[in-house]
């Protein structure tokens, strides 16, 4: 018998292909310390990377246990800075507004948006385990009346057309076809609504996807898109960019520090560092208005 958290709503087909089922299986089974140990610090669980200058003095701590704790806190500070940057690009928003978190993971980004604006948030994840976890966290925080998570497909959410003032993807676009994704965002957003994405993409000027990008794809069972495809797909789906920011230099310190965190590494760190340094991979923020 399957028990469903009362805060989770389901649709009949959260996964609509064999590939999507494999992605759901991956995230239902995922227990990486780099996600869980950082989130335990303040119950803000993120599934994205960090930005900003890292305090590398944490590596000088001689006590192994304290060193691990300091590194964990510093990495979490950097990933929280990334979440705050994304949230800052969603506004201005009011407490009456509703926002949509596509590929919400364990829910940290929706909480950050709610804390900043007081708004209603709907997060969607293909992982039933993540939706249950995120709803439980919202209930423990006492914000479950306004912050809710759903076990649904972000390409076919079933949520209200034109009901959202803002929406975003934070490192989840590489699991889907961009035209299908942006069509759903355009449907959900009211006219003038804001869409924000932070994502890794391969650099068209490099040529094709590099070896390192291919390794990242294999590691996460994803398909990283070229930078150019984001802008083409947005144009086809009534999303007009108003701000583009290259976060590649800002995320490199996070990856360099993480690569030295023996208790948190997943084995993909060197591929990220190399790809960012050789120019084949970029980390972008794009904000767009729905017209």
Q: Predicted regions span which residues?
A:
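Short, glycine-/aromatic-enriched active-site segment of Class I SAM-dependent methyltransferases
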Residues: 200-221
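Class I SAM-dependent methyltransferase SAM/SAH-binding core
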Residues: 98-100, 109-156
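Short alpha-helix
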Residues: 222-238
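Conserved catalytic loop of SAM-dependent methyltransferase domains
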Residues: 243-265
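A short acidic, Gly/Pro-enriched loop at the edge of an enzyme's catalytic core
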Residues: 155-167
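Conserved alpha-helix/loop element of class I SAM-dependent methyltransferases that forms part
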Residues: 55-62, 76-97
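A short glycine-rich, Lys/Arg-flanked "PGG" loop and its adjoining helix->strand segment in the class I
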Residues: 179-194
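N-terminal auxiliary segments of SAM/dcSAM-dependent transferases
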Residues: 2-48
